């Protein structure tokens, strides 16, 4: 239940600087979530605020809820926010201006995401570096290369007509944002990066983090399998840059995380046991090449963490940057869980618990550097 977040969410949405007669805010609630529904009844009535009750049948996913809300919307733009989000008050205005300037080739602009509790513990600091690197470097790089952009799950601003024409969200995909970004690219549309920040709650609990990240990994594999069903067609639609992006970012992210622990274990075994079976299966040259990759790869990722901390002007994140290998261990656990759930519960939406932060949620974050 998101009951504790509901009143705060509405308060933050009320800070959005946009003409009220042009706003149509819809709170999407599960029909059988009686606790949150009762909390919603206590909200002060507003002409621009409505509640949509999503039927409690399978699939019980966020994209299904988004589709229900989208069916009743009439605006020219459609924006998605999560329950814990604190968007820049000028974000809607910035999105409208950006879409008008970019032209009809653009279907969506993605705002940057940051955290309002990034200093809570080591895990939230890792998460801040993770997001900081993605939204400040990787995402703009993909846009500049003309590669498909795996969208984030929140603060996406869509042209409603394009969203409708491309089929909106896949209700069975648990990373509907990444899937939609690929479908938009295949349909010939572009995605831009909006210079505006939405801050949200960084996951501060390791078990909760693994649940969330495993859902992301599972959804990435789903997305890859769906789009790779017709290789010749998808190659023609995406081009070589798009195919590289599909393989490296969509398939490669969960795959490398899953293999990471396996290769670490092999490395430790080779150095400690000197088992002849291992030596026969993996000759020394293979291990020496692997060691080069291990050293250079780790140095590159550590450098990226330090670079991101400096870019964000967050010296308090430097220690977390040097401890990133421990973060990868969590990623490995999440990837293993994702592989298991991909077989046993492919469309199960494992919800992330929110409200675990000790910091007060800011009412009015502004545009600028991701924090």
Report each predicted region and the residues it spans.
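Membrane-embedded multi-pass helical conduit in multi-pass membrane proteins
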Residues: 245-343
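Acidic donor-binding loop at a coil-to-helix junction in glycosyltransferase catalytic cores
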Residues: 174-180
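Short, well-formed alpha-helical segments that are part of the catalytic scaffolds
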Residues: 2-15, 35
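Long helical/loop segments within the catalytic core of UDP-sugar-dependent glycosyltransferases
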Residues: 42-76, 89-174, 214-225
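Catalytic donor-sugar/metal-binding loop of nucleotide-sugar-dependent glycosyltransferases
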Residues: 181-199
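Catalytic core of nucleotide-sugar-dependent glycosyltransferases
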Residues: 129-136, 211-231, 296-304, 337-339
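Acidic donor-binding segment of Leloir-type glycosyltransferases
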Residues: 14-57, 100
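The conserved acidic donor/metal-binding loop of glycosyltransferases
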Residues: 82-86, 172, 184
